[in-house]
């Protein structure tokens, strides 16, 4: 399993809305993530900075990257762009992190 972590952010006034939308995640999106090999996907919020820390375990980089090409993912990005900094394709602005320690 490949461990990935990345940072995103949410608008300060949208913390509750971000959580609400994820509490009601679309079943088709959750199924798509699972079918593409995503496991143990967690997103944490630092309310003081509005920074999001995401962690996911994936089966392969290719399958993970293919999620972005699905229609449901593109719809989710469009749905979220009003509360997050987004790229021109509506994907959230994110920064992939490098692992510097792991204790199995």
From Swiss-Prot:
Binding site for substrate: 18, 41, 76-77
Cellular component terms (Gene Ontology): cytoplasm
SUPFAM superfamilies documented for this protein: Dimeric alpha+beta barrel
Subcellular localization(s) per the UniProt record: Cytoplasm
Catalytic activity, EC: 5.1.3.32
Active site: residue positions: 22
Biochemical pathway: Carbohydrate metabolism; L-rhamnose metabolism
Keyword annotations of the record: Carbohydrate metabolism, Cytoplasm, Isomerase, Rhamnose metabolism
GO molecular function: L-rhamnose mutarotase activity
Gene Ontology BP, a term: rhamnose catabolic process
InterPro entries in UniProt: Dimeric_a/b-barrel, L-rhamnose_mutarotase, Rham/fucose_mutarotase
Reactions this protein catalyses: alpha-L-rhamnose = beta-L-rhamnose
UniProt entry tagged with the keyword S-adenosyl-L-methionine: no
Source superkingdom: Bacteria
Family: Belongs to the rhamnose mutarotase family.
Functional description taken from the UniProt entry: Involved in the anomeric conversion of L-rhamnose.
Subunit structure: Homodimer.
Protein name according to UniProt: L-rhamnose mutarotase
Gene: rhaM
């Amino acid at each position: 399993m490949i461990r990935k972590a990345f940072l995103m952010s949410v608008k300060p006034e949208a913390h509750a809305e971000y959580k609400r939308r994820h509490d009601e995640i679309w079943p088709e999106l959750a199924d798509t993530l699972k079918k593409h090999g995503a496991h143990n996907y967690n997103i944490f919020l630092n309310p003081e900075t509005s920074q999001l820390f995401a962690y996911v375990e994936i089966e392969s980089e290719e399958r993970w990257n293919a999620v972005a090409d699905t229609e449901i993912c593109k719809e989710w990005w469009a749905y979220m762009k009003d509360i997050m900094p987004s790229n021109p394709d509506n994907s959230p602005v994110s920064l992939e992190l490098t692992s510097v320690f792991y204790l199995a």
